[in-house]
Design a protein with these regions (language model features):
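N-terminal ligand-binding/catalytic initiation module
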Residues: 1-156, 162
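Phosphate/ATP-binding catalytic cores across multiple sugar-kinase/actin-like superfamilies
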Residues: 171-172
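Conserved small/polar residues in nucleotide/adenosyl-binding loops
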Residues: 175-177
Length: 177
């Protein structure tokens, strides 16, 4: 973490994301909150919604909002409310999207209201979301590049190896025999 902290401290001074609006549709947890806060500290305007209505942590969402991050999510949203939250993020006119499941990417591609957005790229976290994006590409309707995080070599090197191990240890520590 020290290397990451030093890098962020150095970059905060130059604000490399100043003038960039980022839209996030992710599980709103303490882990993802770090990403959102760092993006804001690096100068970005940040808007987020929960990537899954069942995983949003309300205390984290409230904290993000208190930090000046445009936050549209709460636990237990209905499908209609979930869609409304995605629309609110897109209404901020993000230039880069970070998505988990491609709900926001699909809406940006097929809802005519968002055709004028100047999105120059996105990331997708899940295999299911990447499959949805590939279907958009096969239709010839992909308007901007989308990076598949799941296919990244570093994800296989670190997240799959160490993240899975850490999750196993965390799960075992919760078992009370």
């Amino acid at each position: 973490m020290q290397i990451l902290d030093n890098t962020i401290s150095r970059l905060k001074k130059s604000k490399p994301l100043k003038g960039v609006t980022l839209g996030f549709c992710l599980h709103i947890t303490k882990e993802t909150s770090v990403l959102l806060i760092v993006a804001k500290e690096l100068g970005a305007k940040v808007a987020c919604c929960g990537g899954n209505p069942l995983t949003t942590q309300d205390d984290i969402a409230a904290f993000l909002a208190s930090q000046g991050i445009h936050t549209y999510c709460w636990a237990g949203q209905s499908p209609k409310e979930y869609d409304w939250c995605i629309q609110q993020v897109l209404n901020h006119k993000p230039q880069i999207l970070t998505d988990d499941g491609s709900d926001m990417n699909v809406k940006a591609h097929f809802d005519k209201k968002y055709n004028s957005l100047k999105i120059f790229g996105a990331t997708e976290e899940t295999t299911a979301g990447v499959n949805r994006i590939r279907a958009v590409e096969k239709q010839g309707k992909l308007r901007y590049p989308v990076i598949s995080v799941n296919d990244a070599y570093t994800k296989h090197m670190f997240d799959n190896k160490y993240g899975t191990g850490q999750s196993t240890i965390d799960g075992l520590s919760l078992i009370h025999i």
